[in-house]
Amino acid sequence: MSEGVDLIDIYADEEFNQDSEFNNTDQIDLYDDVLTAASQPSDDRSSSTEPPPPVRQEPAPKPNNKTPAILYTYSGLRSRRAAVYVGSFSWWTTDQQLIQVIRSIGVYDVVELKFAENRANGQSKGYAEVVVASENSVHKLLELLPGKVLNGEKVDVRPATRQNLSQFEAQARKRIPPRAHSRDSSDSADGRATPSENLVPSSARVDKPPSVLPYFNRPPSALPLMGLPPPPIPPPPPLSSSFGVPPPPPGIHYQHLMPPPPRLPPHLAVPPPGAIPPALHLNPAFFPPPNATVGPPPDTYMKASTPYNHHGSRDSGPLPSTVSEAEFEEIMKRNRAISSSAISKAVSGASAGDYSDAIETLLTAIAVIKQSRVANDERCRVLISSLKDCLHGIEAKSYSVGASGSSSRKRHRSRERSPSRSRESSRRHRDLLHNEDRHDDYFQERNREHERHRDRERDRHH
């Protein structure tokens, strides 16, 4: 040691160019701050014929951006963590499954487990960095883990070097369809993403515990994107060319947020594309794959129910997409008032024995509510259902009263004595139901009511 110190003093007095020699030592990870003279062979450090460089007593710089292969060979575990890359497994492999395979070969000192994730959707790329606590564990992983089967795939284990990282990254891009990493490729084109950024131990990366699996929080099939608002839908929505098929979600721009697995795991039974009715909302959220397994998100005003209507007349009605929240509340308030008033008037008329006017009032209220722009909403259906229940009750009461025959004959005589009122009522209904299809539906319902009435009268007389 003393001879090494004398050499340092002599070279320092002669103003030896230590900067150029120190630049060559940047590529070598030193064991400690001070090296002995025996650890300085000139043929290992420099290819030049100059005398061996002196040993600096100041701390050596960290090899941040030098070749990891040389660092891994020289340093051992002193300035670099003991880590390997484990890859070639399926994207749905969990951290627990990987740890179990590692423990099966006798390695129990796993310190950290980092999955390489797709920047766009958080899906696993099929390889991970495994950090262990000892170099012996690294040797075991490199010797015993390759060839182990994990979810039907033989895992590949390599030292944690930048070159191996690039190889695993290239394999991941081949395993994922082009749609899955189209956003990644665009990011790398403008210099914002490189393979090393996806999986490099750095302070900028937020380390997650092994139990956190971001790509498992994304639905791999028709589940909606729970955490995201629905995508903006420009009105009017484009309708599908085939009848009975829901229109595709217009203007969807979140396809890159949805995990498009190249193949589905055996424990997730997912039907083929197109076999799932409108859902997401898979969502929305995060996420339906871009291969059309997810239908349009449910609309507040049942906008998607129009193509499913069995009556062709419903398609010509007003589009609910133009109804704002305030307008919807106003229409619902008016419908509630109509329903309440019609029920009160019908009950009052039925109590007075005027069943004909009560039935006419309820039928008119039902027709008006059905014609409103929010008729397909569940709350409107509740109003219509209550009106129909009241109508059936009044009809049943009128039939029971008419069993004696007097009430029925009185009702017929009343209609014969006042044909003007019947014509006025019919004209009023035609004005309310100016739509031809709704007009037909209304009178079909009236005809069915009269047919039921005639059948009951006939059965009563027999």
UniProtKB/Swiss-Prot annotation:
Residues 409-460 are annotated as: Arg/Ser-rich domain. One of its GO terms (molecular function) is mRNA binding. It is found in: Nucleus; Cytoplasm. Keywords: Cytoplasm, Isopeptide bond, mRNA processing, Nucleus, Phosphoprotein, RNA-binding, Ubl conjugation. PROSITE patterns: RRM. Residues 82-162 form the RRM domain. Belongs to the RRM CPSF6/7 family. This is Cleavage and polyadenylation specificity factor subunit 7.
